[in-house]
Amino acid sequence: MHFISTRAHAELKRAILVFLFAAASTSTLLADQWALLVEPSFMDHKMRRPIEGSQRTVLAIARVVDGEIQPLTREEKKSVHMTYPMIQEQALQTASEVFKRMKPTFVRDKNQVIQYAAIESEDPLTASCVLAPEFAAAFEETLGPDLLVAMPTRNQVLVFSKQDNAHLRLAEKIINSYLTSNYPVSREIFTLESGNLRSLGILE
């Protein structure tokens, strides 16, 4: 019969506890993340941040818990000991994770020139992927360094070159997507400036 010494037993117990703690921490990280939702201003989100130049679209602060989006309430905010920059930093990491899962489709004209990129997904955070710090760089080779983005619905993003007016040619499509969606976001066109959204106006 083999016996384990008291010291070896203590070390084994300590190793198991460290492993369980690490596993629990990882589980919590994956299950509870911060997110910034690009949302229409008519939604009654209590904790929101403005988007420069926009009166119809906001960034709503939310948690993603076990895959479920839970907008932050004022009551919940009282128990969250984090500043907005701290929440934003984690939310941008969430946006990056979402963007990595996206597969943009490039739409070309009859001469095979890229007109715009379309991102569509069932992920409810699809529109928020534009906040990923690496978003603009991912399209620089195809659409140039200056981008325009439209997010007519929670599940759709259209990316254009700022040097073209392709977004105007698609205005009717963008508006129709917004009006017919169960989860509309915005009928505005935005620029991405240093990772921040700025509204250029509403498509008519």
Model-assigned labels for residue ranges:
Residues 25-26:
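N-terminal signal peptide c-region/cleavage motif recognized by signal peptidases
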Residues 3-16:
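Bacterial N-terminal signal peptides that target proteins for export
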Residues 2, 20-21:
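Short, charged low-complexity linear motifs
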Residues 16, 20, 29-204:
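Contiguous interface-forming segments/domains that mediate binding rather than catalysis
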